[in-house]
């Protein structure tokens, strides 16, 4: 009885996996065989060019001095607003426990 359930479950899983793989292979084959129109090709080429420039520079691409000044100004504002601590670490908070007065309850 248990073996029948296991065989039934394995056949269901096998068929589900095969359908999923057939669907994925069919979609990717169509996507790779599709020719791009000239506008799409230019767009994709520019994105690849930008990616290679960004990886080479290690940061933003084609920035001028005004961008760096704006970045420094915004970082300065953040430091003024949230303290002069390290901006890369999460701040530590210190909360004091409230002081409670003990009030004697009158006996009646």
UniProtKB/Swiss-Prot annotation:
Q: Which residues carry this modification: N6-succinyllysine?
A: 84, 94, 99
Q: Which Gene Ontology cellular component annotation is one that this UniProt entry carries?
A: proton-transporting ATP synthase complex
Q: Localized where? A: Mitochondrion; Mitochondrion inner membrane
Any GO BP annotation: proton motive force-driven mitochondrial ATP synthesis
The modified positions for Phosphoserine read 108
Cite the entry's keywords alphabetically: Acetylation, CF(0), Hydrogen ion transport, Ion transport, Membrane, Mitochondrion, Mitochondrion inner membrane, Phosphoprotein, Transit peptide, Transport
Q: Which residues carry this modification: N6-acetyllysine?
A: 41, 46, 79, 84, 94, 99, 105
Q: Which Pfam families match?
A: ATP-synt_F6
Read off the transit peptide span from the entry.
1-32
The entry lists its GO molecular-function terms as: proton-transporting ATP synthase activity, rotational mechanism
PANTHER family the record matches: ATP SYNTHASE COUPLING FACTOR 6, MITOCHONDRIAL, ATP SYNTHASE-COUPLING FACTOR 6, MITOCHONDRIAL
Q: What is stated as this protein's family in its record?
A: Belongs to the eukaryotic ATPase subunit F6 family.
Function (record text): Subunit F6, of the mitochondrial membrane ATP synthase complex (F(1)F(0) ATP synthase or Complex V) that produces ATP from ADP in the presence of a proton gradient across the membrane which is generated by electron transport complexes of the respiratory chain. ATP synthase complex consist of a soluble F(1) head domain - the catalytic core - and a membrane F(1) domain - the membrane proton channel. These two domains are linked by a central stalk rotating inside the F(1) region and a stationary peripheral stalk.
Its subunit composition reads:
Component of the ATP synthase complex composed at least of ATP5F1A/subunit alpha, ATP5F1B/subunit beta, ATP5MC1/subunit c (homooctomer), MT-ATP6/subunit a, MT-ATP8/subunit 8, ATP5ME/subunit e, ATP5MF/subunit f, ATP5MG/subunit g, ATP5MK/subunit k, ATP5MJ/subunit j, ATP5F1C/subunit gamma, ATP5F1D/subunit delta, ATP5F1E/subunit epsilon, ATP5PF/subunit F6, ATP5PB/subunit b, ATP5PD/subunit d, ATP5PO/subunit OSCP.
Protein's recorded name? ATP synthase peripheral stalk subunit F6, mitochondrial
